[in-house]
Amino acid sequence: MTLAKDIARDLLDIKAVYLKPEEPFTWASGIKSPIYTDNRITLSYPETRTLIENGFVETIKEAFPEVEVIAGTATAGIPHGAIIADKMNLPFAYIRSKPKDHGAGNQIEGRVTKGQKMVIIEDLISTGGSVLDAVAAAQREGADVLGVVAIFTYELPKATANFEKASVKLVTLSNYSELIKVAKVQGYIDADGLTLLKKFKENQETWQD
C-alpha cells in the first residue's frame, strides 16, 4: 500500500473519519457533508500516530529539503509539529489563530528569525482559510514559508483556489479520493454511497440533488 492508502485505512479503522452519505453532517460553514473528520483522534493510537509522523518527515524531506523550522497551527497542528520537529532535530514554533490579548500579544510562540525557512503543519484541509491565515502571520514575522503539509484534504476546489491565490504550496499525506476508494474496498460504504461521495467532491452545493 502507498502512504496515502495506509493513512486512509487507519483513519477509517480508528473512526477519525465518519462517512454518512445518506445522513450528512452539517459543517460550521453550513455545508451538508457526507464526511466528518477528527484527526486529533490519531494521537491516541501509537501505530497510526507513528505512521503519520514518519509520513510527515519523509514528505517534508522530499518536498521541502531546505526547511529550517517547523511550525504547527493551534491547536491541531501543535502535537504533530512538535513530534516532527523532534524527529528532524529542528526548531519548533506554533501559530495562534489570533494574537494573544494580554502579555506580549504574541501570535507566534517560539523563536522565528527573519528569513528562516518554515514548513507549517496542519491536520486537515477543508477550504484552507485558517492555515493560510497562519501562513500570513508567519510571513508578517519575517518567516520564509516554504509550504504547508497536512494529514488529509477534502480536495475542495475552494481550497485549491485559496492556496493558488496565496502562492503557497500544499502537500498532504492522504486525500478524499484515496479515502473513498479504500472505504469502498473495505466495506464502509456501498456503490450508491460511493456515487454520492464522488458527487460531493464535484459540487458541495448540489451533490444531494
From Swiss-Prot:
Its EC number is 2.4.2.10. Orotate binds at S126. Its cofactor is Mg(2+). 5-phospho-alpha-D-ribose 1-diphosphate binds at R96, K100, H102, E122, D123, L124, I125, S126, T127, G128, G129, S130. GO terms for molecular function: magnesium ion binding; orotate phosphoribosyltransferase activity. It comes from the Bacteria. Pathway: Pyrimidine metabolism; UMP biosynthesis via de novo pathway; UMP from orotate: step 1/2. It holds the Pfam family Pribosyltran. One of its GO terms (biological process) is pyrimidine nucleobase biosynthetic process. It catalyses: orotidine 5'-phosphate + diphosphate = orotate + 5-phospho-alpha-D-ribose 1-diphosphate. The keyword tRNA-binding does not apply. Keywords: Glycosyltransferase, Magnesium, Pyrimidine biosynthesis, Transferase. The keyword Magnesium applies. Belongs to the purine/pyrimidine phosphoribosyltransferase family. PyrE subfamily. Homodimer. Catalyzes the transfer of a ribosyl phosphate group from 5-phosphoribose 1-diphosphate to orotate, leading to the formation of orotidine monophosphate (OMP). PANTHER family: OROTATE PHOSPHORIBOSYLTRANSFERASE, URIDINE 5'-MONOPHOSPHATE SYNTHASE. NCBIfam families: pyrE (TIGR00336). This is Orotate phosphoribosyltransferase.
